[in-house]
Amino acid sequence: MITGLLKKVFGSRNERLIKQYRRTVEQINALEPKFEQLSDDQLRGMTETFRQRHAGGESLESLLPEAFAVCREASKRIMKMRHFDVQLIGGMVLNDNKIAEMRTGEGKTLTATLAVYLNAITGKGVHVVTVNDYLAQRDAEWMGRLYNYLGLSVGVNLSQMAHDQKQAAYNADITYGTNNEFGFDYLRDNMVYDPSQRVQRPLNYAIVDEVDSILIDEARTPLIISGQAENHTDLYQRMNGIPRLLERQIGEEKADGTGVEKPGDYYVDEKGHQVYLTEAGHEKAEEILAQQGLIGEGESLYAPQNITLMHHLYAALRAHSLFHRDQHYVVQNDEVVIVDEFTGRLMTGRRWSDGLHQAVEAKEGVSIQQENQTLATITFQNYFRMYTKLAGMTGTADTEAYEFQEIYGLEVVVIPTNRAAQRKDLQDQIYKTSKERYDAVVRDIRDCYDRGQPVLVGTTSIETSEYLSDLLNKEKLPHQVLNAKQHEREAEIVAQAGRPKMITIATNMAGRGTDIVLGGNVEKQAGFVEIDPNLSDADKAARIQQLKDEWQSLHEQVKSFGGLHIVGTERHESRRIDNQLRGRAGRQGDPGSSRFYLSLDDQLLRIFAGDRVRAIMERLKMPEGEPIEAGIVTRSIESAQRKVEGRNFDIRKQLLQYDDVANDQRKEIYKLRNDVLEANDVGEMVKNLRESVLIELFREHVAADTMEEQWDIAGLETRLREDWGLELPLAKTIEGAQSIEDEALLDMILKAAEERYEGKVAMVGRESFAGFERSVMLQSIDSHWREHLAALDHLRQGIHLRGYAQKDPKQEYKRESFELFARLLDVIKNEVTRVTFNVQIQSPEELEQASEQIEEGLSHLENVQYKHDEFAEGREPVEDAPSLRTGAAVAAEMAVAGMPKVGRNDPCPCGSGKKFKQCHGKLS
C-alpha cells in the first residue's frame, strides 16, 4: 500500500527513466532540420568527425544526440524508415547497458542501429547477437545498407565459415552472429597454437537480441567443445533391455511409509526430472546384471568397480521414462535429433551428455555414437559478462527483471509503445480432460475461420501440433503447420499467417523474429516473387505491384474481423513464453485477441496446481465439456508458473555459483596459455618452472632449518641422477667442507642444472629450442586442463552428498576444486620441466619434427563436436559422462573407491546417522 502511494506521488523508476530519456529525445528532434540540410557526402563524413572527436577525449554520451540524429537521417534516406521517438528511447537504453523491453512489431532491429552506430565509432567492435544464423544474416544484410552508407564495415559470423572469413567478420566495425558461435569462437581462440589463428578481438560491446531466450532459457546449459572418449556401444545395447524388465512405481514413498499407489522397481520424479531405483528395484537390477555376466554373483551395484554400470543403468532408465519421441527428439536418417524445447526447432548436431544420448539411440535402435570428452566449456553467463558493455532487447523481459539484475547487472526498462495496444487477453478456460480441451480449441478455430479471422495456434511439442493438425484435417479446415520438421519453410508460413482465414499451428516460438502482419507480410511475399526463376523481370514487377494493391484491402478486412487471434493449447512453465505467444497479436496498435485452453492432464497443472483446480471443479460440480473460466483459477496457474520460474532461477543461479569456481580457474589457465603464446621467448618461464621443481625436490630431502645429520643426501643424489641425469658429488662436497649451508648446496644443484640445460640449447640454437619449449608447455596445459575438466565434473556430480555430513556442498566444492587446481598446476610444472630437461635432441630438424608432432596431436582432434546441450524441460545443466577415465578423473574417484563394503541397511560410514541406502548409497 505504501509502495503504491509512493509510486503515485513520484512515479515508478521506469517512468522516471523514460522521463529523463524524453529530454534527450527533444535534443535529437531539434537537430533533425540541421542534418536534413546536409548532402549525402556531408552526412557520411559525420562518422569520421565523431571518431576524431571521440579520439580527442569526447565521451560517447556527449556525442549521443548528434550521432542518433545522423543515424535517423541516414535511415530515412536509405531504409525509407524514420526512427520513432520511442525507438530513440530504446537506443539510449541499449547504450546505457540496460535491457529494452519493446512489444512485438515495435521495431527492435531498427532501434538497435542507433546504439550500434554510436558504439561502432570507437573502432573497438560491436557484436549484435541473435538466436539463429538466418536472423544474423537477414539483419546484417538489411541493416548493413545503413551502416555501409555511414562508412562503417559490417561482418556476419556464421557457423561453418572459413577461418579467414571469420577473422574478416570480427575485424569489421559491426559483427552479427549467433550466441553459440560467439561463445565457441572464444573457446576455440583459447585452443590455438599460433596467435595469428585467433579470430576475436577483445570483447567490447554486445547487444543481445531476444535477450531472454539467450541469457535465461539457454543459460542453464554450458557451451561444450568435446572429442570422442572410449567406446561403450555394447554396454548401452545390453542396458537398453533392462528398463523393460523393471516395473514402474506409481507414487512416491513419504517419510511415514505412505504415498505409494502401486509398488514397483523404480520411481520417476517428473518435477526433478530424475529416476530412482527402489529397494526392490536394486535387488532385481543386480539379479539381471549378474545373469548377464556384467557383475559378479552376489556383488553390489554400489561396489566401486560398478560405478560406471550404475551410470549406464540410470541413463537407460531416464531414456525410457523421461524422454519421448516427437516431443523431446525426433528420429531422422538413423540419428536421434534433439528438439529445442523453447523454439520447437531441430537441433541438428547437438547431443545430450552424460551418456543420455547414447541411451536414447539404443532405445530407438539407431546407430550408437561414441561418448565425448570435454575439451573446453563455458556458460553464457560467464561468456557475456566478459564484455565491457552489454545490453539486450526483447518483447518479454519484465517477468525476469530480478534475474537480469542479479546475474548480469542489467536493468530492464519497459519502452512505451508507439501506438496504444488493442489486444484483448481473454481468461483461460480449463477443462477436465485433454479431449474436451482440444474439442474447444477446434470449435474456436472453426468460429474464427467462418468469420475470416486469422488464427495462430501455439503448441508446446511437435506431437501436439501434429495431433491438432489431424483434428483440423478431420474437420476439413485448411491450415499450415510450423514446427521443427518444417523450419525450412518457416519464413514463408509466418509471412502468410496474418491473411484472412489463415490457420497456422506453431510449436512454441518457432518463427520468432519474423513479424506477422495483418493481411500478410507483403515484403516477404515480394521477396519470394523476386527469386522465382519462372518469372520475367516485367512479370515480377507487375506481380509485386498487384500484391501491394491487394494488401491494403486485406489489411483493413482482417482488422474488421478482430485482427490475429492467438490460441494457446497449454500454459508453458514460464509466463514469459506465454507472453511471447500472446505478443504475436496486436502489433503496432493493431487489434487482436488471445486465449489459453488448458486441461487437468497438462504437466504444469498436474505437477504444481492439479489438486487445487480439481477440487474447485468438483465443488462447482462442472458437467463434462464445461470449462472453468475464473480469475481464481488463472491466479492459481500463474502462482504455479511463478513457483517453476523461481525453481528454474535457483537452478541457473546454482549452476553459475559452481561455474564461477571453474571460471576463475579457466581465466587463470587461459591467461597462462596466452602468456606462453605471446612471449617472444618462453625460456625464462621454463627456467622459473625448473628452479621451482628442483627447489621442491631439494626440500623433500633437505628440510629448511635442520641439522646436517638430518639431511637425506644419498636419497637426493639418487633422485637427481635417475630423474634429471645430474651426477653431483653432494656427499663428498659436504665431507670436504668444514661447514656448509643448505642454500650453497641448492645453488650448486641449480647451477649444474642450468649448465646442462644450456648445453642442450646450444646444440640446436636458442630460437629452435624456444619453439620446442612453447609446444611442450601448450601441450601440457591443454591435455591436463581437459583431465581437470573431467575431474571437476566428477567432483560436481557427487558433491551434494556432503550435505548429509552437515557440510556446505558449495564450500566443499570450492575447497576441493582449488586443491585439484593446485595439483593441476603442479603436474604441468613437473611435466614441462621433465620433458624439456630430459629430451634427447641431436639436430634442429629433429627438434622441429618433435614440436610439430606435439602440436598436431592436439590441434587435429578427431570428431570434435560443438554442443550447447538442452535437456528436455531445460531443467538441468549438462555434465560429461562419468565413464571418462582420465588420470585426474580417476583421482577424483579415489574417495569412492576407498569406501568400505557396507550393507544397504547399515549406518552410512560418513557419520551422517542415516542408512547407507539413504545417504552415500544413493550415489548414481
From Swiss-Prot:
Family: Belongs to the SecA family.
Compartments, as annotated in UniProt: Cell inner membrane; Cytoplasm
Protein name: Protein translocase subunit SecA
Domain of life: Bacteria
Binding locations of ATP: 87, 105-109, 515
EC numbers, comma separated: 7.4.2.8
The protein's enzyme class: translocase
